């Protein structure tokens, strides 16, 4: 009985023992990340690397407004469709925005040669100077420049024509051979446009040009072509059976372009001295213009983000994150978020780092919880926390810096005859996009795995640091906790935390406590052995008495015969 009381007293006394636990921070975060081995791991802190939002507007880029073509196409704008007159004064822009199906393109039907290439060239132009290459009133004294209008290019209810081209017709019943040249003295590339008229019948050809065998010749250092009108009846388009084919060339600085014709020339009126700029482009978008500034524009809307990746749209203009097909790219910076079930004993003991983290420790990632006669409390290990924060911050910044190559990515232009090339280009682009997406996702998975392992290692190192200081002055009780064999006041606890614990100072007290506990264990062990022997003997006696009683009863009623032979 005395031994039992000692055991109970020992257990009750142990409850009052001073303890220190090593643990880590937890909070109410619901952020989840993926690693190589796990999905949807809840963590205390993380950073998002993927931008998935936009404002739905067309915005200025670096303070410069875009050229919004509205109901006009690039062709209608550059040729001077009279319905696009509001655009003629625009000479600089950050990018060009065209709607998917603009109404005002080539008002007089015909073929626009190398149109996709022209769009590609204009996509790298951020401004131009629109100037008269051949002034209307003085360049063509032997030809009429006012009668070349058509109802298909009407403006305000009246027949009109392109504002950058002149339709030259006969004058006084004659169409003399013409020869006109221009020397590029702009010190920039000059875009020159012209056209060739193809009447629907010979009557129109004679009436307009007074010749049946017309030609148009255009020559420069890098361009040389002779055109012959094709007179034929064609299906009506915009109420026209005739056609005008449109052509263009880029004239280098100092180069000369020469026009010769005896009919059917749609002559240049205005040309454009081009200024190319990095980051410009042409996008197709239904978004409306907004009062906003941005660094990155997509057809869906503007993106204001410094993140390295985005999944808004593959076509971008400006300083834009790289497009990937991922739906989630989140990099962990904190720890696994597993708040402990804070079941508290008589003195508020809580679980250590094995069972979960501490929501009560808010000033660090790793730290301690102690309890003694003076009370209990949390304390972060500032040094290990700061080292971890610095290391992870540097890693995240390095990843973002390496992957954050911001650039413009505009779509390539192909005509209807280049569908196979376009399909091949799409497959190549899709392949690159898949590689980028895979690389981005793999990078995040690997870094998340390393970061969580890094945190686990830091907690373990902190535990080993305490264990190496305490040695046999305390015992491990699991869950990251140690129970002291001696009294450990707040000053003692602080010395453990900062690594200055004086082991010899407490070793004698700890030794006596250990011997006392070991003695109680031995005494209680002897009592339990006596009780076990007593129980075994008593059970055997009861069994023998029972067997004797049964045998006597069976002999008395004749069920069992007993013979004793001498």
Curated annotation (Swiss-Prot):
GO terms for biological process: clathrin-dependent endocytosis of virus by host cell; fusion of virus membrane with host endosome membrane; fusion of virus membrane with host plasma membrane; viral budding from plasma membrane; virion attachment to host cell. Palmitoylated. One of its GO terms (molecular function) is host cell surface receptor binding. Residues 1-17 form the signal peptide. It comes from the Viruses. The keyword Signal applies. Keywords: Clathrin- and caveolin-independent endocytosis of virus by host, Clathrin-mediated endocytosis of virus by host, Disulfide bond, Fusion of virus membrane with host endosomal membrane, Fusion of virus membrane with host membrane, Glycoprotein, Hemagglutinin, Host cell membrane, Host membrane, Host-virus interaction, Lipoprotein, Membrane, Palmitate, Signal, Transmembrane, Transmembrane helix, Viral attachment to host cell, Viral envelope protein, Viral penetration into host cytoplasm, Virion, Virus endocytosis by host, Virus entry into host cell. SUPFAM superfamilies: Influenza hemagglutinin (stalk), Viral protein domain. The keyword ATP-binding does not apply. The record marks 344-345 as: Cleavage. It holds the Pfam family Hemagglutinin. InterPro entries: Capsid_hemagglutn (IPR008980), Hemagglutn_HA1_a/b_dom_sf (IPR013828), Hemagglutn_influenz_A (IPR000149), Hemagglutn_influenz_A/B (IPR001364). Disulfide bonds join 21-481, 59-292, 72-84, 107-153, 296-320, 488-492. It is found in: Virion membrane; Host apical cell membrane. Residues 551-566 are cytoplasmic. A lipid is attached at residues 555, 562, 565 (S-palmitoyl cysteine). The chain crosses the membrane at residues 530-550. GO terms for cellular component: host cell plasma membrane; membrane; viral envelope; virion membrane. Homotrimer of disulfide-linked HA1-HA2. Interacts with human CACNA1C. Binds to sialic acid-containing receptors on the cell surface, bringing about the attachment of the virus particle to the cell. This attachment induces virion internalization either through clathrin-dependent endocytosis or through clathrin- and caveolin-independent pathway. Plays a major role in the determination of host range restriction and virulence. Class I viral fusion protein. Responsible for penetration of the virus into the cell cytoplasm by mediating the fusion of the membrane of the endocytosed virus particle with the endosomal membrane. Belongs to the influenza viruses hemagglutinin family. This is Hemagglutinin. It comes from Influenza A virus (strain A/USA:Memphis/10/1996 H1N1). The lineage of its organism: Viruses, Riboviria, Orthornavirae, Negarnaviricota, Polyploviricotina.
């Amino acid at each position: 009985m005395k031994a039992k009381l000692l055991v109970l007293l020992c257990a009750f006394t142990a409850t009052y023992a001073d303890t220190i636990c090593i643990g880590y921070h937890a909070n109410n975060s619901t952020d989840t990340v993926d690693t190589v081995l796990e999905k949807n791991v809840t963590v205390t802190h993380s950073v998002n690397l993927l931008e998935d939002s936009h404002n739905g507007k067309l915005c200025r880029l670096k303070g410069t407004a875009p050229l919004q073509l509205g109901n006009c196409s690039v062709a209608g704008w550059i040729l001077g469709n009279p319905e696009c007159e509001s655009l003629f004064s625009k000479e600089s822009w950050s990018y060009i925005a065209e709607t998917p199906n603009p109404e005002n393109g080539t008002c007089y039907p015909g073929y626009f040669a190398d149109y996709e290439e022209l769009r590609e060239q204009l996509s790298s132009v951020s401004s131009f100077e629109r100037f008269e290459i051949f002034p209307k009133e003085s360049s063509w004294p032997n030809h009429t420049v006012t009668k070349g209008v058509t109802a298909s290019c009407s403006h305000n209810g009246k027949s009109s024509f392109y504002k950058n081209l002149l339709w030259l017709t006969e004058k006084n019943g004659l169409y003399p051979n013409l020869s006109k040249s221009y020397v590029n003295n702009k010190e920039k590339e000059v875009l020159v446009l012209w056209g060739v008229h193809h009447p629907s019948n010979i009557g129109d050809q004679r009436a307009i040009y007074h010749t049946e065998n017309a030609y148009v010749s255009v020559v420069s250092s890098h361009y040389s072509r002779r055109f012959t009108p094709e007179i034929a009846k064609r299906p009506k388009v915009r109420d026209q059976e005739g056609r005008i084919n449109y052509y263009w060339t880029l004239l280098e600085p100092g180069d000369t372009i020469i026009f010769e014709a005896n009919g059917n020339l749609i002559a240049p009126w205005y040309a454009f001295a081009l200024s190319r700029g990095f980051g410009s482009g042409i996008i197709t978008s239904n978004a409306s213009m907004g009062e906003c500034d941005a660094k990155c524009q997509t057809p869906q809307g503007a993106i204001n983000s410094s993140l390295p990746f985005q999944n808004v749209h593959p076509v971008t203009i400006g300083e834009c994150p790289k497009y990937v097909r991922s739906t989630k790219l989140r990099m962990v910076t904190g720890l696994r978020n597993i708040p402990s079930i804070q079941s508290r004993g008589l003195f508020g003991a809580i679980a250590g780092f094995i069972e979960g983290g501490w929501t009560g420790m808010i000033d660090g990632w790793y730290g301690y919880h102690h309890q003694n006669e003076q009370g209990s409390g949390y304390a972060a290990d500032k040094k290990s926390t700061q080292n971890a924060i610095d290391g992870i911050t540097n890693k995240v910044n390095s990843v973002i810096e390496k992957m954050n190559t911001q650039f413009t990515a505009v779509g390539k232009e192909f005509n209807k005859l280049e569908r196979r090339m376009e399909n091949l280009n799409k497959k190549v682009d899709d392949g690159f996009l898949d590689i980028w997406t895979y690389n981005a996702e793999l990078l995040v998975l690997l870094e998340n795995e390393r970061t969580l392992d890094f945190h686990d290692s830091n907690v373990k190192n902190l535990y080993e640091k305490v264990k190496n200081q305490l040695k046999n002055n305390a015992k491990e009780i699991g869950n990251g906790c140690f129970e002291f064999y001696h009294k450990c006041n707040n000053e003692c606890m602080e010395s453990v935390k900062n690594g200055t614990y004086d082991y010899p100072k407490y070793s004698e007290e700890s030794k006596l406590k250990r011997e006392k506990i070991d003695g109680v264990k031995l005494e209680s062990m002897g009592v339990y052995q006596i009780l076990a022997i007593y129980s075994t003997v008593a059970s055997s006696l009861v069994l023998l008495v029972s067997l004797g009683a049964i045998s006597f009863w069976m002999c008395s009623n004749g069920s069992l015969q007993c013979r004793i032979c001498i």
